[in-house]
């Protein structure tokens, strides 16, 4: 049994041991860096990889991806990242090449299919600190160590978290407690269409080369988990220095980011039909004026453009509410600006099968770049058009037809017909050149012609939404020229 006068000594000894332990709590970030990159001070880690890439492109259905396979080599350390690679589309027999050379002060980038360097901005250069983590987290770990990012005390079980904001992206590292290796990285970035978008790089199957631990498998979940990619490291070595992949041109500097200046032209095309042309996006928006209300068709890319269109529509008819907003199909040039119309209480019209995607866009958080719907949330109202919808007020009629896959473009494709004008408005199906006779109709062009004929529509003129001026094609098209292209 301990004597009473020994108790203070025992308690003091216990406290004396406990205090140093608390003061020297493990620094998981530095321990991780020590294993995964610190030894690369005078050398670089060289990684040969292959990857599967799935991209959201202009496909037939929402969330449908285009599949690519890639191979390449990465050279990386704390102060540099280089990549030379090829990308091949699974459905097309063509190989694309790209090169990237990054440092904390520079970015040289030749994009797939380009001959010259991409004009990189300071924001894009900053973003490569975390973009490179798709292949290797070395540069990103170095950034967190150099900036002495503190640990988050509310980490998930078994993990220690660290958070930093780089440019506009919230970057989070999650390090495993049991071995102090990086488990995964999450990115939360603003996207003009999808809102707050998360991307996760999950690191698996750690191996070692030249004393550096690296993940041999990286699984990528992007677009809020809607799209999955994978990178597999096939070989890893260390070498004294990375090769010079790209040479900076004379006077090289990052291009300052320039704000887009919206240029708008409004035209009263017919008594009930108005066009709003957005020159900065090369789009034509249709405003249909009824006796008591308006219908707006198409809003390109983002909420900012949607707000511009709302403003111009109010100028056309200040006392008339916008009852409907309709997008010809689900691609960003037509649906991207829908959220301001949701905020204004318009009913959103969409083609067959696109309802869940439209609902997703309407409900998507936009906290990183708030728009009107984020600041003042409103419920959305929608209506699917599977066949035909007629909008009329007794004096003027608009018919909306879902031609879907017949368009040769998307499964939800809508066209707008005005019987009294013998006019049909569509998004992007016709490619008749401005100069010279019409060539042979493309699949899209033929699909539109056949859809018009199958429905018995009397059409004199076809008006196209995009492109208004680029690509050298007509966008106000006599129907006889569409007929000629079918011969």
Model regions: which residues?
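Bacterial N-terminal signal peptides
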Residues: 8-18
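N-terminal mature ectodomain segment of secretory-pathway/periplasmic proteins
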Residues: 26-117
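Flexible, processing/modification-adjacent segments and terminal tails
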Residues: 102-171, 177-179, 189-195, 248-255, ...
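Gly/Pro-enriched, hydrophobic low-complexity segments
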Residues: 156-247, 414-419, 426-427, 432, ...
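Zn-dependent metallo-beta-lactamase
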Residues: 228-291
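Conserved beta-strand hairpin/beta-sheet module of binuclear metal-dependent hydrolase folds
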Residues: 267-313, 413-432
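Active-site metal-binding motif and surrounding structural segment of the metallo-beta-lactamase
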Residues: 304-349, 455-459
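Divalent-metal (often Zn2+) His-rich catalytic cores of metallo-beta-lactamase-fold enzymes
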Residues: 448-487
